[in-house]
């Protein structure tokens, strides 16, 4: 962690300096640190290090309606004692249970809710982060309450069992998650390395031991690591920086500095023991995935050149001639992704290539492996081209130059976390910083992508397993990875014509701002075809915009078969346009299709090249799949239906509520039956019908003018023939009536249960919507305190509001 000391003259500090200056010349104050911020960011930033070593970043924003704070501690699950795994997470829970000045266990959350705010915290491998947002007037008291988490916590033993139960419930809710299970197994392979911890904790790991009990161990952990010199604080409010600094001094200078060394993982692994494995993993859901997971040395210090991201940029490209493009065209995969986690295990990280397999790909996994490993060998021998450096730099620079604001709660949390990783000057720009292609760093990373550091994962329900995973549901088998002929793999790559990707043609070149209407303006682009245009507050002063083109048809609402065909259309479009979507994403734009009461094509981001993006997007509307591609889309759709049943129960509330209250929503059984009978000929006819008989409308928000709107319609005319008579097709919706009750029960094939209990206002009005949101804020806290904390009936307890066409 980097501690940057900045001299600030509060009254006390100034008096101290005066006394010293009476006897000798006063020392020159250190120059203030300048935090590198986006040119689009008008907020004022300042940093200070309190006398106790606590680093503080203050963000003064005159426009913010609420204040926010976050404090990160540079310790996480990797520092858990082995006899109390989950300790860091459990301590995070206990700190919410009251402090000396505010002893009520529910006082902190109640205070936040009563003042229009919210609070949360999380524990990761190497940090623990606490955050709160609050009405501006309540900000000083919020800081007082938050600071006492660390300066005067009660750690009341009366809440040990309840918080252990809460931690246990959190673990239980996630124990069937494949992502959690795979991550746990990844770390279990590391043996004695500190990353091999059960990070959440449960009743067993947090139980009193013969040698010592949980409560004194908790106090010991707090005293050992919760030191001001390991902490970073972020304050965001409309207050001037000087006033925020005074608040920080007043409340957070009381946190003791124990001069603790930053916890650093240094344990080395024996690659002969932890790598060179084939892991067969049998998931709960019907997945078909293969991963190449390389263990790499931590290269987080190379954040200015980002070798992992740069290499992933090349290997994960969808451009012609790349592995993703070729393997998709062969019908073997539906998706390829790369990821680089520089410090996932502390002193080690991972570089991963993950592919989603088709049924045909499942039969040819070794060939796919040869393509991927052969391509890496090709890059190693040829050297990664530096021609992508400029477009990569430009992509990141554009994002930073026109960086958009996010909510202050999330922003404070992200800055507090970044302060643990980067110099204070670069906590904002570090993710966007690219000082140029670093050949040495890229070559060093490529040299680590070798079989000796590789674990290959086969993830499917077809895997034969012989072991169970501790703490999580994870049947698996581990065997030594058979050696493959790299020269044969390289020959295959050359035979397939694989090469390094071509360059991006969608990067914006012009950033001019256009005159946009402040109010919604309707533009009749053709008979019975109206588009709407409005400047957007979200993109105010930015050369960005959001466009949505909608083709609506009642055919999507009155037939389960048509609903399925729309979903298949969306799936096939996303698959076939993955290359374009990836190219657009790199250029700072997004492209997606969604299906509901028709189809919607959505673009957002920089507006300069959106006409080119739209032209290419429209060319792919008629997806024209082969029989094989269509069959694979149906198979993916059926698997998605089945897999949704194994999702966390609370994540299914929204789609089930939609089925209960809206027309054009169907049961899983009816969707599966319709999909099993789908055929390519009917699908092709349906697509043509939608494109030639539907109602067309479009919305343009942001940096557009009327000429842009009309030009977009001209582009559309070559691909779409909208109906001149059809109206917009809107799904019918349940009209709440006093005394009426709707009830839906579903059995789920997972251990956890869920319940949604809702009330609908019979009168549709904006006023009722606003009142419902206020009520939901208080209900959320009451439900959490009563159902989760006091009665221990569940972990994910809360409340919220949603609208059924203005019915809250």
Residue ranges and their predicted role:
Residues 18-21:
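C-terminal motif of bacterial Sec signal peptides marking the signal peptidase cleavage site
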Residues 38-70:
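Mature N-terminal segment immediately following signal peptide/propeptide cleavage
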Residues 109, 154-172, 240, 259-273, ...:
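Acidic/histidine-enriched alpha-helical segments
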